[in-house]
Regions:
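Extended, low-complexity, turn-rich repeat/linker tracts enriched in Gly/Pro/Ser/Thr and Asp/Glu
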Residues: 288, 455-459
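Short strand-turn-strand beta-turns centered on an Asx-Gly dipeptide
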Residues: 461-467
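Extended carbohydrate-recognition surfaces in non-catalytic/accessory domains of CAZymes
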Residues: 370-454
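Bacterial Sec-dependent N-terminal signal peptides
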Residues: 1-20
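Residues within well-ordered beta-strands of beta-sheet-rich folds
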Residues: 122, 219, 434-436, 448-450, ...
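Beta-rich carbohydrate-recognition and catalytic domains
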Residues: 20-118, 122-201, 205-263, 271-324, ...
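Short, solvent-exposed loop/turn segments in extracellular or other extracytoplasmic domains
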Residues: 472-476
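Conserved small/polar residues in nucleotide/adenosyl-binding loops
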Residues: 477-483
Length: 485
């Protein structure tokens, strides 16, 4: 009888342990409601020209300042630039950012001479917590993408994981010290199949409970081919350390992946909500999605077994600044507002850092530079310096005159917020928008005006010619212009 009871207890305990690995759907829905950010604020950091791309935000707090590191690629295309460097910016309100300078620069003659894309380590993992970076042995730490190949990421040569540190003030721009060799490489004797092609972004967390047997837990994504299916993709794995310098790969890697050829699962950003760890991550080229890249989340009780969220994605392409890719999360909650930082890429392949929020926080004034377009069709952007004034409105009575103001479009006298921009204020009426521009007429060329609208209808007049009343709220209006007045 004792043996039978022992066997029953053993089966029950095993089942309970297995069941706990799956985060219940009800809890996943609670997490989604807590972290969703339906209001897109716009760009926070954008390059000043078309020969730089900004990527991979990491946001943290130091004293009364918010800081953000990000990586900068100094090329227009994938092969014409040298590679990544790491920069830092500061903010008072998480929305408006000032660039301070570099923290990881190119260094000639080293293993990482052309690629130095960094990610600060040991952040406070508590959701809504301090978001400060912890020190270990009197230093702040950072892992980074490193390599000698030029170009965007691993386009010419594999990338490895490097380690940097500083004893200085992390709220200032100064060069961090670095090791003379990578801490993880695809050539290591214990390198695993899922990372044999290249290694990418990494972030190190300080797990003082030593859940996996060591205090320092690195999540990193890497490229490799599955040994059984031969599917090529990016997956997320773990490495462990007791001293930040010597690392051992977790035997159960990869811990998180989506097995479809060419699919990317990466850039894990983890925070703890009560007894549940939440991993914000991005996926790209997922066959089940119509868009190319997006941000979503998974949850875990043990840092290893992750339950994927099956509901609506957190960030998807929906604006003219993120229409190609909206991906690579860094999420913080401060004073009751959730800020979701992500990398925004448009169809011109301009790349910057954008923000979405859980509450309406206004609209950013940061814009990408005008794209360079070299093809048979020449496109001239006419979004700047429009004069506008209201001619009639529901909140104004009787005859009135108001002074015109100069704005850049898109512009609205009312505020529109919410998913699909369906919720708006109470201002109804008519506004005038006027712009003077000159287009040189060339023989054999046709000229068009395209309007993307935010109102309901627009009556359009060009050079005194009335083009009529057009609905331009949902899509766009395309007008063919005469080449003679």
């Amino acid at each position: 009888m004792k043996k039978l009871l022992l066997a029953v207890f053993s089966i029950t305990a095993t089942f309970s342990l297995y069941a706990q690995r799956e985060v219940p759907q009800e809890r996943m829905e609670q997490i989604y409601e807590e972290v969703k950010t339906p209001y897109k604020y716009g760009l926070a950091v954008a390059p000043a020209d078309n020969y730089h791309k900004i990527d991979c935000p990491t946001v943290f707090r130091q004293g009364d300042k918010w800081l953000m590191t990000y990586v900068v690629y100094n090329g227009k295309g994938g092969t014409d630039g040298r590679g990544y460097e790491t920069w830092i910016a500061e903010s008072d309100n998480l929305l408006e950012w000032r660039t301070l300078g570099r923290v990881l620069s190119y260094r000639d003659g080293k293993w990482d001479c052309n690629q130095r894309g960094g990610f600060p380590a040991l952040p406070d993992m508590e959701w809504g917590g301090s978001y400060e970076l912890q020190t270990y042995k009197g230093r702040h730490w950072m892992t980074y993408i490193g390599g000698e190949g030029t170009g965007y990421e691993a386009v010419k040569a594999p990338l490895y994981v490097g380690l940097a540190w500083t004893k200085g003030d992390i709220s200032t721009a100064h060069e961090w010290e670095s090791l003379d060799k990578p801490i993880l490489s695809i050539h290591d004797k214990d390198a695993q199949w899922w990372e044999k092609l290249t290694q990418y972004k990494s972030t190190v967390y300080w797990d003082k409970d030593k859940t996996l047997g060591a205090p320092f837990v690195m999540y990193y994504n890497a490229g490799g081919r599955h040994p059984e299916t031969d599917l090529k993709g990016e997956r997320v794995g773990i490495a462990l350390s007791k001293d930040m310098k010597t690392w051992k790969r977790y035997s159960g890697n990869p811990v998180f992946a989506h097995e479809a050829d060419g699919t990317i699962t990466g850039d894990a950003h983890i925070q703890k909500m009560g007894d549940v760890y939440v991993m914000f991550y991005f996926s790209a080229f997922e066959p089940s999605r119509k868009y190319k890249a997006f941000n979503t989340f998974a949850a875990s009780y043990d840092l290893v077994n992750w339950t994927d969220w099956k509901g609506a994605d957190l960030i998807i392409p929906s604006k003219n600044y993120d229409e190609l890719f909206a991906h690579k999360s860094y999420v913080v909650k401060h004073d009751g507002v959730v800020y979701h930082f992500y990398c925004a890429v448009n169809n011109a392949e301009q790349r910057g850092i954008a923000i979405a929020t859980s509450k309406p926080m206004g609209r950013s004034t940061v814009r990408f530079p005008k794209p360079e377009i070299k093809n048979r069709r020449q496109i001239t952007t006419l979004n700047e310096d429009w004069k506008t004034w209201i001619t009639e409105a529901t909140h104004l009575k009787g005859n009135f005159m108001m002074r015109a103001k100069t704005v850049n479009i898109p512009h609205n006298w009312d505020d529109y917020y919410g998913y699909r921009q369906l919720t708006h204020g109470n201002l109804h009426g008519t506004a005038m928008y006027v712009k003077d521009f000159t287009a040189d007429v060339k023989s054999g060329k046709r000229y068009f005006l395209r309007f993307d609208g935010v109102g309901t209808y627009a009556t359009i007049t060009v050079n005194g010619k009335d083009f009529g009343r057009h609905p331009i709220a949902v899509s766009y209006t395309h007008l063919t212009l005469p080449t003679k007045r």
